[in-house]
Amino acid sequence: MLIKMKDLNVINYLNKNNIAIPKNIKISTVDIPSYENKSQRIKDVKDQQKHANMKFTFSNPDYSGLGDKFTWAESCIIISYNYGEIYSTNISTSIGKGAIARFAIDDYYKPIKKFIEKLKDHFDTLDLRTQEFIDSPSHYDRLFFEGSGLGWQGKSSMMLSPSIGPWQLIGNLYVEMKFETPVAKSYSCGNCNMCQISCPTGALDNEYKIDSRKCISYWLQSPEIIPHEIRTKIANRFYGCDDCLTSCPPGQNKFISLKKTKEVDLEKIINMDKDNLISKFEWFYVPKRNG
């Protein structure tokens, strides 16, 4: 296929090839080689023990943090899915019920996977190589996010975008085709520290760095015994904690509701057998099942 230079803007290219970008998805690109490398940043967190006992991208930082993974790749397409539009922010639950954090209400990686498969199918027809990374321990998913112009890293350590805030998940697709990198944009949290103020355990006391040893979300996914000082802060949370997300001003584009949040009956959960529990919440990260 003969491609004119102006078509190498990825959005123009997809439009010309009748590939629709789904609702709530934003995309951008970076050139490869990118010379982007976050390996040392990951190692620093690990050396300071702030990763707690998480594996994931900490298992092999030299690879997961490396931007230029493939000599054949000419670009990486970054896909951001805004799941914040699906459910409004709620802040209450009923007595005897357990709250599920907004990021875990559903498997929000599904739309990213579906769109990336569509892109891969297209590039396959051109005999162009691709490699995707979606929620993978082999790739630091936010590696190219800032360089692509989609947003910035907030003081909560989450990736933020204007009007979306932290309510997004990220996928990456390396492609054997050269797309132009957008002009760099300058974003910042400025003097805002709402995420730090809202964190119930002080896991964000050092801005831009999360101490997983204090993070409720980490402990609710850990097979270890939860420390007493964390237990007293968990309250009625069943899975996850998103206080740092709900407090983030760029993500507050909807009214906060006092209605019940997504919740589960804790008594039923306790009496549910393993197979039914996994079936009901198959997208949850469960230690020893997911590795």
Name every feature range the model reports, one short phrase each.
Residues 191:
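SIR2/sirtuin NAD+-dependent deacylase catalytic core
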Residues 53, 184, 230-291:
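Alpha-helical scaffold domains
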Residues 154, 168, 210, 264, ...:
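Residue-level signal for pocket-adjacent positions within structured domains
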Residues 98-99, 221-225:
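A short small-residue
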Residues 2-188:
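Auxiliary alpha/beta "docking" domains used to position bulky ligands
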